């Protein structure tokens, strides 16, 4: 079930979170045993350090440019680009500039 989002309206996901100086901001839209969906904003230079997920993680950049390091390989993604980070593989996210992304994890 979706939460923290209006239903039956047209919207832009990137407008669900604002930038905050020196922070990573997140808003969870779905969280259950099978699926997690979260919208993030990263201020320039902010990061989520290396970690692994218990499910396959798909990120789509909604605005700006982010750097994703997956098992040592670097990917620079811009608005509209998507990357799947496999389950149990170390990955990290870094704000090359202010950017927003949607993260969907399937367990």
Task: Annotate each predicted stretch with a short phrase.
Residues 30-32, 43, 53, 61, ...:
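A short, compositionally biased micro-patch
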Residues 87-107:
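Ligand-binding loop in jelly-roll beta-barrel domains
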Residues 55-67, 71:
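Glycine- and acidic-residue-biased ligand/ion/polar-headgroup-sensing regions
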Residues 1-34, 69:
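A short, N-terminal "cap"/entry segment at the start of jelly-roll beta-barrel domains
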Residues 22-23, 36-53:
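Conserved short histidine dyad/triad with adjacent acidic residue
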Residues 72-87:
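Short acidic-glycine-tyrosine-enriched beta hairpin
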Residues 62-63, 78-79, 97:
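A cytosolic small-molecule/anion-sensing beta-strand core signal
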